[in-house]
Structures are given as structure tokens and as C-alpha cells.
């Protein structure tokens, strides 16, 4: 991807993208001027988004949302490369310089083919998106969280165009559509848009982890009895995977209130207590990211 993490025994709990966007103060496109380990990464702003103006050259020399889970004392490093073109989500530090959320989040690298390695859900789950689509979706997302206003008609058109198609997989002739569908579903979630259950079922039933998670998460924006019952039955179904069940639990918790929390509490002992987590390489410093088992997810809900 062009950005590596040089952290041996340092691990952290990686935040979800929604939290990162909410807490960030600036969204910019920039060029990397230099990266010196003892100083930080100097970038030149190409353009800024939203009302928070940021121009010229600035220094990134810290992290704003870093929750360490282990440390060897070796320290953390910004390993960006000179001349890279990158989108950054930034916060201002007390020293007047700037911070990204963690060493592995809050940035999206623009590749030579003008695709962006984009994060909509979590840095563990990235998508290769055309730069035009990335800017269209992220401009709307950023404006929504910072000004409560965005071009709803344009974004809904993009979302509907992609989710009305048959769910795509990882095949060579499908992967581009898969990434667009991922961006569409996740953008709808981040913008608090409601998509009917009947339109999302095909993604939940499709044999693709990412499509399942995006659609189940998006049901968090619905508030009808049919959706609540659907989620509850999905959680009870032994054939469904633990990760997806946890997402369904969180969605049902948001829309179901105390009534469904009580129902979930009654079935928690029937659910798995195995934590599957995000998977990936055990040497990845993001292994400290908390992701509960279905049983633990219910136990962690507010009563």
C-alpha cells in the first residue's frame, strides 16, 4: 500500500472510522514533503474540505486517538514516503502541529492509478476506490458530521446505483463493483441513511463477510419491527458467524432499546463465547483492537 507500520511490540486498540471522523478537525489532501523519524512528517496541503481551512506546509508529529494495549518502549513511527499523495484526517496538537488518529488510521493513500486505499468502516477493512468516488462520498460524510449538510440527492443516487445490482465478490471481473458496493453501503451507514431491509437481505445472505457486515451494520439506521425481529433471529441462528452476529447485536441494541436487550440477555448463554476478532497477521500492531464474542457483546450492553 506504500505505508508500513514500523512497530515491533507496540499494539493498540484501533478505533472505528465513524469515531475517527467525528473526532477529527481537518480533512485534507496533501503531498508528503519529508519524513524524519525524530521530527515527524511534513506535508503540503493540496486542498482542504469543509469549512475548517488549512493551507501551506504543516507537520504531523503525533496521534490523537491512540489507545496502547502493549509497549516495548521502542516507540511509534510515521512511515510515510516522500512525494506520496494522501488524504488525511487531522487534529491540532497543543504544540501547534498536527496528529493523525493512530499510526495505521486517519489516512488514505492515492495510488498511481488514481485509486484511493479507502477506509469507510475500519482500517482492517480497506477498499480500492476511484479518487472521484472517494472525494464524492467523503465530502458528503465530512460535511454531514461537521455541518449537518450534504448533497443528499447525489449520494443517494450513487448508493442506489450500486446496491440495486447483484452482490459482487472477489473475482477479477467483480472486484471493482465489490469495492463500490462496500463504499455505498458504508457511506449510507455513516450518513445515517435508511435502506429498506428487503434491499439489504441479498447482501446479508451472500457468501461474503464484508457484504454481510456492511448490510447488518446499516440496519442500525432502521427502526421498524420487521428489522428488529430479523436481527434477533439472525443472532439466534447457529449457522451465522460470530463476527456478523456481534454486528447484528450492536445494530439491534441501537434500535431495539430495553425490550430487545432483555430478550438478548435471555439467549446470551446459547451464544458462542469465542472471540474471532478481525483476524489478520498476529504481528499486526492492531491486534490490540477489542472485538467481543457474541455472548460478551450482549454482556457489555447497557442495561
Positions of predicted regions on the chain:
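Short inter-helical turns and helix N-cap capping residues of alpha-solenoid HEAT/ARM repeat scaffolds
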Residues: 176-177, 207-208, 239-241, 272-275
Amino acid at each position: 500500500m506504500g505505508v508500513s507500520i514500523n512497530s515491533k511490540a507496540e499494539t493498540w486498540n484501533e478505533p472505528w472510522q465513524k469515531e475517527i471522523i467525528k473526532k477529527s478537525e481537518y480533512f485534507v489532501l496533501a503531498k508528503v514533503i519529508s519524513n524524519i523519524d525524530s521530527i515527524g512528517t511534513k506535508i503540503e496541503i493540496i486542498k482542504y474540505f469543509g469549512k475548517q481551512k488549512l493551507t501551506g506546509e504543516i507537520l504531523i508529529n503525533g496521534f490523537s486517538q491512540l489507545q496502547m494495549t502493549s509497549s516495548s518502549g521502542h516507540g511509534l513511527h510515521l512511515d510515510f514516503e516522500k512525494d506520496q499523495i494522501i488524504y488525511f484526517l487531522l487534529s491540532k496538537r497543543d504544540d501547534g502541529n498536527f496528529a493523525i488518529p493512530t499510526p495505521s488510521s486517519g489516512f488514505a493513500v492515492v495510488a498511481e492509478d488514481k485509486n484511493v486505499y479507502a477506509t469507510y468502516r475500519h482500517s482492517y477493512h480497506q477498499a480500492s476506490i476511484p479518487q472521484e468516488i472517494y472525494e464524492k462520498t467523503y465530502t458528503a460524510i465530512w460535511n454531514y458530521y461537521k455541518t449537518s449538510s450534504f448533497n443528499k440527492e447525489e449520494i443517494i443516487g450513487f448508493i442506489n446505483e450500486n446496491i440495486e445490482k447483484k452482490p459482487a465478490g472477489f473475482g477479477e471481473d467483480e472486484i471493482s463493483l465489490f469495492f463500490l458496493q462496500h463504499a455505498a453501503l458504508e457511506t449510507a451507514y455513516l450518513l445515517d441513511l435508511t435502506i429498506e431491509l428487503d434491499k439489504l437481505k441479498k447482501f446479508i445472505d451472500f457468501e461474503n463477510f464484508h457484504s454481510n457486515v456492511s448490510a447488518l451494520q446499516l440496519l442500525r439506521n432502521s427502526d421498524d419491527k420487521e428489522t428488529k425481529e430479523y436481527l434477533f433471529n439472525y443472532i439466534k441462528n447457529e449457522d451465522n458467524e460470530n463476527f456478523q452476529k456481534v454486528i447484528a447485536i450492536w445494530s439491534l441494541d441501537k434500535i431495539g432499546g430495553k425490550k430487545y436487550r432483555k430478550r438478548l440477555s435471555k439467549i446470551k448463554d446459547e451464544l458462542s463465547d469465542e472471540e474471532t476478532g478481525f483476524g489478520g497477521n498476529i504481528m499486526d500492531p492492531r491486534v490490540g483492537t477489542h472485538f467481543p464474542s457474541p455472548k460478551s457483546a450482549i454482556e457489555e450492553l447497557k442495561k
